[in-house]
Amino acid sequence: CHGSDGKGTCWYPIGNGNRDTEPGINLKNALAAKAELEGMGYNVRLTRTTNDENPSFKQRVSYCYPNNDLNAEPDASCYVCIHSNAGGGRGSAYIAADGSYTQKWIRTSFEDDSNFLGECINNRIISETSLSEYAGGVINGQGYMILFNKCPVPAGYMEIGFFDSSDLGILDSESGAIGRAIAGGINDYMWN
């Protein structure tokens, strides 16, 4: 998804994997992370709670605001985008924010904060699950992603394992550990 042109265009190469598999994996990981975070005392908002939902990007970003009011000041501390990768690899990484972002409400430290959030989560994933580190833990050159161009708070864009490789077994069997790692990484970010 490219967002820096102000309009936002999305393209997903269907040939890179089974689009019926990834949403379910991501939701399991998100629900596990939510349970862990709530156990730590955090208030968590999910953009979807079932596989039947596919909210627009505007709807997803609205969860950063009180009562989903895009005219209000954001009240979320961070936004975590949980994905699985595809295309012939193994391991976990975060997509680095590396652009010139101008959306309303962002702090001057948006890029650094977003990357630190992604790094905190990924460090936990590779140390607390069977997933390895992909690409040194960070995917550069994709800072144009619409999330980074529209999100008003620091955004961690995670690519957790490859659902079209042997990582799928880990993603299926270790969603609890992955959720705990995501929650632990968010907590690390919040306290540093």
Task: Indicate where each model-derived feature is located.
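Substrate-binding clefts and substrate-entry loops adjacent to catalytic sites
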Residues: 101-109, 164-169
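Loop/turn elements at helix/coil->beta-strand transitions in domains of secreted/extracellular proteins
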Residues: 37-45, 70-79, 128-132, 152-156, ...
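Extracytoplasmic/secreted envelope proteins and their assembly/folding machinery
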Residues: 27-34, 58-61, 114-122, 175, ...
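Active-site-adjacent substrate-binding region
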Residues: 110-140
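Structural recognition of the beta-strand scaffold that forms the well-ordered cores
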Residues: 43-48, 77-83, 92-96, 103, ...
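Mature extracellular/periplasmic domains of secretome proteins
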Residues: 57-76, 96, 120, 145-150
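Active-site histidine-acidic residue metal-binding/catalytic motifs
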Residues: 1-63, 74, 88, 96-102
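Active-site-adjacent mobile loop/cap segments within catalytic or ligand-binding domains
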Residues: 81, 88, 133-192
